Amino acid sequence: MGGNIKFLEAMVDFLERNVKTIFSYPGEQILPLYNEIEGSSIKNIMVRDERGAGFMADGYARITNYIGVCLATAGPGATNLTTPIATAYKDNSSVLAITGRCQRKYIGKNYFQEVNMDFLNFYKGYFVDKAEVSYIAKAFADCLFNKKPVQLNIPVDLYKEEAKDINITTYTDIYKDDETPSNNIKEIDVKKPLFLIGQGIFGTLSYKEIVKISKILEKINCPIATTFPARGVINEKLENCIGLVGRRGDLKSLLEADKIINIGSSLSYNTYVESVREKLLSKTENIQLKPKSIKELKEFFENLDVKNSSWIYKNSNKFQPSGDYSNKIYEIIKNIPEDAIIVTDAGKHTVFTCLLKTCVIPRNIISSHSFGTMGFGLPASIGVKFGTIDFNIDREVVLISGDGGFLMNVEELQVVAENNLKILMVVMKNNSLAEFCKIKNPNFNKIADAFEIDNCYIENVDEIGSEIKGYLKKNKPLLVVVETENEPLPKPNI
């Protein structure tokens, strides 16, 4: 790009080079950018609520291991992003939130929709006060390399100014992630070693590289456990894979191990539960890895010598469905492809899905694992679907949601309908919010009819298989409403 150009044009040129899809909702203070994106090569997905834009960007980021971008106007548009950005912050997801602002001369002067926008800076935010493309590049780099959400707040009068540093066309032009974490560990010489793998092992690997990690890990001569978001990084059917550990997983293996080698886990209270936390921390060795290529990861494990490990640990805590709710979840899981991307909301359905699903590939389950956000499921599954399209990921997308969470962002069914997104959307209708209280529900099937989305209603568990098989043969969305009885959750490890 040469010559004198406006900041708006330079910004969209940068976005075109680095982004395929943006999730947005228009508004006065962001309208110049919104309109310019509409005329670009970027897919501009208009959501029906800014919360949907944030959650879609989050789902997109999680499946692609890249950046998900959302766009919202100033004031109420930006405040609607608060919960999605908080979710991305807690769950370590690369979401870039581009927000509008009034003209600079009105900032701090009680102007229409003007508020301090720092509330979105959970990790970091940039107030763009100069027409410099470097702001955008820095925001991209911070977002991608640190796996955290970043806000880019732009006053509306800045778009007309002449752009500076237009030679910057991608985030790598100004940001070189040359950091090579130093790991002194070369050998592991204990009788009962255990590897704990968290999602940090994904680094900045591409999706195609991430799915190859299992082949590397299966050669390690000791048990391997994972955190919730890292499930499937090693196939849970393999002999040396324990699977999920912690609050909703196996705890005995962590206690029996002589040493725990942690790669990529933040060691949250979901993984190291409070009752044994200090004991587990005392025997944990943390390895800092931020792999930028699968080759780098392969070389690390090839040079790591695991000595004297004859320990074979079998996870005997496999949960079996026993009630109406868990049996119906299990029937859904049995009838979808084993590599399907299951997106859950927050609630009982998430716990049962977690307990009943054997994960065979990374991102087999995507959930708000650290923030527990209701309303996450539907828009996140939409973002996941767009991610699979943009990055040629040939996997089915399945939403399993509760009735309470589904209603929180039900308006985003319009995005599903407009784009004919093939998503299997399951609503577990038990007419309650977990064990908290009973709720009254609308007719979900009539809601689907209003959006002109195919739908069905299921009462009996033996109806589930045929409906899913029929769906898999078609190329359009389906909403499945599953009437179910309540069922108490098994007690977690605490």
Swiss-Prot record:
Pfam families to which the protein is assigned, alphabetical: TPP_enzyme_C, TPP_enzyme_M, TPP_enzyme_N
Cell cycle keyword on record: no
A Gene Ontology biological process annotation?
A: L-valine biosynthetic process
Look up the record and report any one GO term of the cellular component aspect. Answer: acetolactate synthase complex
The record's Gene3D superfamilies line, in alphabetical order, gives: 3.40.50.970, TPP-binding domain (3.40.50.1220)
From the Swiss-Prot or TrEMBL record, what is one GO molecular function term? acetolactate synthase activity
| Superkingdom of the source species | Archaea
List the SUPFAM superfamilies.
DHS-like NAD/FAD-binding domain, Thiamin diphosphate-binding fold (THDP-binding)
Keywords from UniProt, A to Z, are:
Thiamine pyrophosphate
Q: Which family does it belong to?
A: Belongs to the TPP enzyme family.
Please report the name of this protein according to its UniProt entry. Answer: Uncharacterized protein MJ0663
